[in-house]
Design a protein with these regions (language model features):
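Extended low-complexity acidic/polar segments
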Residues: 2, 7, 98, 109, ...
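Active-site neighborhoods of divalent-metal-dependent phosphate/nucleic-acid chemistry enzymes
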Residues: 76-134
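Helix-adjacent hinge/juxtasegments
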Residues: 51-83
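Aromatic- and histidine-enriched alpha-helix N-cap/loop-to-helix transition segments
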Residues: 37-43, 103-107
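Short glycine/serine- and small hydrophobic-enriched flexible loop segments
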Residues: 47-54, 113-117
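Short, well-structured N-terminal submotif of metal-dependent ribonuclease cores
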Residues: 1-41, 52-65, 144-145
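A general alpha-helix detector
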Residues: 10, 44-48, 91
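Alpha-helical elements of the RecA-like P-loop NTPase motor core of helicases
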Residues: 12, 22, 90, 136-140
Length: 147
C-alpha cells in the first residue's frame, strides 16, 4: 500500500496533543507501508512547528529533528516527493475550478495523484490521509482509500 499524507496529517503526527495524532504517526512508522507527502509539506510542517513553540506547546528543535529524521532520504520512513510544478499546477487549477477547494489542499491532491501514477505498483492500493472533509471527498471520488 502507498499512502499519501496531506500536510495536515503529517503535522498532526508530530503534535501529540492533537486529536488523532497516533494514526498518521503509526502509518509513517509502519515498514510495510510506503508513506509519501509533497515538498510543500516541509514548509507547512515547519510553520506549524514554529507556531507550536510560540504557544509553548512544544520545542521547535525537537519537532524539527523528528521530522528531519523521518524525511531523511537515506533512511527515513516518509518520502518527500518533488513533482513537476507545471503538471501539479494544471491538476490543482482544475480541482480549484471544479470544486472550489483551497489552493494548497488542491495542490496536495494533485501531488498525490501524480505520485500515485509514478510510484504505485499495478493493483497497489493508493490511500490518502487528510483532516479536511472536502479534500477527502474529492480523494474518494478519485478512487483513493481514505485513512
Amino acid at each position: 500500500m502507498i499512502v499519501y499524507l496531506d500536510s495536515s496529517a503529517v503535522v498532526r503526527s508530530y503534535l501529540a496533543d492533537e486529536a488523532g495524532s497516533a494514526s498518521p504517526s503509526d502509518l509513517i512508522r509502519d515498514p510495510d507501508i510506503t508513506t509519501v507527502t509533497g515538498s510543500w509539506t516541509r514548509i507547512e510542517a515547519t510553520s506549524a512547528f514554529v507556531r507550536a513553540e510560540r504557544t509553548g506547546r512544544f520545542v521547535f528543535a525537537e519537532l524539527e529533528a523528528a521530522f528531519l529524521r523521518d524525511t531523511d532520504p537515506a533512511g527515513g520512513n516518509l518520502l518527500v516527493v518533488d513533482v513537476s510544478q507545471a503538471e501539479v499546477e494544471l491538476i490543482a487549477l482544475r480541482v480549484v475550478r471544479e470544486h472550489g477547494l483551497r489552493a494548497m489542499d488542491a495542490w496536495q491532491l494533485a501531488c498525490a495523484h501524480l505520485t500515485f501514477e509514478a510510484l504505485a505498483e499495478p493493483h497497489e492500493q493508493a490511500a490518502f490521509v487528510t483532516r479536511d472533509a472536502e479534500q477527502a471527498r474529492i480523494a474518494r471520488e478519485w478512487g483513493y482509500l481514505l485513512i
